[in-house]
Amino acid sequence: FRVNNATLETEDHPQYIDVIKVLLNTPLAPGAQTEITTPFHVKLPKHFSRGGHVGQSYQATQWYPKPAVYDSKGWHPMPYLDQGEFYSEFGTYDVRITVPIEYVVAATGELQSAEEKQWMRERIQNTEFRIQNSEAASQKPKFLKPTPKKPAPKTPVKKSTNKAPLKSKKNVAKPAEAESKPAEPAIAAKPNATVIATKTLQFKQDRIHDFAWFADKRFVVDYDTVKLASGRVIEAWSFYPQKDTLWKHSVAMAKDAIHFRSKLIGEYPYNVVSVVQTKESGGMEYPTITNIGIMPDAKTLDMVIEHEVGHNWFYGILASNERDHPWMDEGINSYYGNRYVAWKYPEKRKRNWLESKIPENQTKLNVAIFAKEKKDQPISTASADFTEQNYAIIAYGKTSLWMKRMEEQVGQARFDSCMQLYYEQWKFKHPQPEDFQRVMEQNSGQNLTELFHDLHTQGAIQDYVGPKKIKPAFLYSMKDYERVNYVNFLPAMGYNMYDKFMVGLVLHNVSMPSHTFQFMLAPLYATGSKQFNGIGTLGYHWNPRKHFQNIDLSVTGARFSTMEGVDSNGAKVHGGFHKIVPALRFTFKNRSLLSTVEKWIEWKTYLIGEKGFNYVMDHDDSVSYPTPGVVKNRYLNQLTFNITDYRKLYPYDAQIQLQQGDGFYRAQATGHYYFNYAKGGGMQVRAFVAKFGYLGARTSEKVSRSFLYQPKLTAVRGDEDYTYSNYFIGRSEFDGVASQQIMMRDGGLKLRTDLFAGLQGRSDNWVASMNFNTTLPKNLFPVDLPVRIFADVGTYADAWKKNAETSRFLYVAGLQVSLFKDLLNVYAPIFYSKEFRDNLKTAPEVNTFGKRLSFSFDIHRLNLRKIIQR
């Protein structure tokens, strides 16, 4: 950085890599000027966030050094954030962009070349030109001579401001020279290099605080003029890279936005407005120009164009500090977007059956959902402090509702008058929240203190508070959630090998916003066992503000068959289980809603009744036949502490669990850690350790009674799921496909050793294991495959004894296919310990590739309430 050809000292920011302090050699007095120059070079990355390139289409945004704003509150150095926009100083921009001659450039400000404007207008009328240029971006540019490569576009920039203007030291034409000529083709060449035909375009604009430009040789151009109420005529441009039936009306949409905002807020001060379609974008505003992604329909495109063009008033002209006060741009802008839709689309769209079950004001519903869970944030929250969801729901949505409430309180006519005065008084001056409040109060004649206080509070915006009616609804309904508690119903089905198909009904009140009392009941009639089964849960759900995020008190229950037989009379008999599980969970509150960590502690008591078979020998054929046995009851107390970090990189969870039953205890710890690979995919690592012991002396009776609870290394089968927490197709099967279902618990070695009890690594002392599974390298396959490599290794107490049945460490490795977001996993063991190989050879009937396969079906991991909330 230089001033008057003298190099300036700089200081790196201690935290932000993209912020630097430039130390002037002499102080800059109020009202004085200085010119700072610097060369800079930018390599546009593949498009991400707001800019970059997609093939040979370029989106140059946030691409040059900008001076921080110095206002009454001091300096505002700001790093680039994907969530959180900008606060920049006004100035006069004079920018020249050099590109290959066939490129169309859309940019902030007024294009100075009449010849280039005429060339673009010719593209509007030349249908053949449109068709040729709607082809893929891989078309080669027109060269004066053949060339394998073209240089990157050169983009000098000059910004004049009373603070710290910037310009490039290279290739900056003097204004008089630049304005005396239209844009002309030039020849860019280096010694021994291929010559490329280029052109240099100049754009100028005053009273703006940013500059963006977009270049694409496929751009189709539309153009019109807009006559404002004052009689001033401005230009309206639209650029899109292919024939698009939606975008053929984009100029008309931009004109409507200019007219609408100018009438309600104040006249648009610039002489040009442009909209650009870019593939990798949602919508992003810059002074006089906005880029918009591909939209699903014309109405959505119109709404997005109006929203982004509308930013010119609040982001562009008023230019509040939207990094600290995003509501002053995004929220107020969204309010006017709602008014635009009501004005232009007064007829209500016919809603389909599912849409009819939610309220028309979905913004209000979203605010209520997060407020009920105590996960909302005040409107006044800074951009960087918002969660991703709240940034959209609160900064945009709730603010628009708050503005509507102000309009209703003040009256629309007076409200519009106040907003026009606010605009006229503060345009190009960076108003603060207190300035906005002062203007609204002084010109409305009302004390709005209470209303503006709501900017700093949490909670829903309610139009009704009172008793609610109870109404039935098929599937679900949230249509009138403020006035009605819905009891929802829908058909239910189930299947296992003993009950066969089950049909029934789900009754629930799981909804959004969540209820304090929640229930879900699913009675089922089993066509096989001819009995009523089912599952259900009743619970209370609290969201205190302090200490805990949630407190959940619940009781769940279930009843199903787990075995089937035929008695001596040829009649089918069934055995099964029922359980009742009271639970109390405390989910700890994080200091910040931005935290990705979830911590909870939970107590459960399993009260389980099981009915098996007694076997009676028939004297006629000397065959033992099953008869229904008596119900045997057992219990299990369980205390669990869990911590999970859902961060994008290296997420993990860890769980410590203590269990106690009749005469025994079991303590275990399980951890998962995901190592992300730089090029996508990653490795999941699981660690497990368990300690088992007896309450009192170890006796043969206790050993037998607690055998089911003892940890083991190899795959856990259905009849070893002692809490009945997993879904099994055939819980008690020992052959067939159903017998190959396992669950991920204990050591997790994915090899079934049903015939070899001594090889299962079971212990009434301790067990430890590590499990790994990794995605395949991305560069090996053209598409992502749901195939992984797994490897398991473990040890247990008895393996360290003298004359142990197995080696100290057992291992299994192979391929894993994961489907439906890991709900269904299929495991194919290929390499495994010598003990496994030798023993499997003695049982050829199970030692085939197909019989060694196993699978897990982890439907128990689904949480209906959490799915709905997300």
Locations of the language-model features?
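A surface-exposed beta-strand-loop module
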Residues: 1-56, 175, 182, 186-189, ...
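Hydrophobic alpha-helical and helix-loop surface patches within well-folded domains
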Residues: 20, 167-168, 174-176, 203, ...
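Transmembrane beta-barrel strands of outer-membrane/channel proteins
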Residues: 40, 491-495, 505, 521-525, ...
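Hydrophobic helix-coil surface modules that form long, contiguous segments used
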Residues: 67-75, 83-126, 138-306, 335
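Solvent-exposed loop/turn segments connecting transmembrane beta-strands
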Residues: 428-431, 492-505, 510-516, 521-534, ...
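Outer-membrane beta-barrel initiation region
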Residues: 449-547, 592-596, 614-650, 753-766, ...
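C-terminal outer-membrane beta-barrel translocator/porin domains of Gram-negative envelope proteins
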Residues: 491-493, 533-535, 539, 550-573, ...
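Outer-membrane beta-barrel "beta-signal"
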Residues: 817, 821-822, 846-870
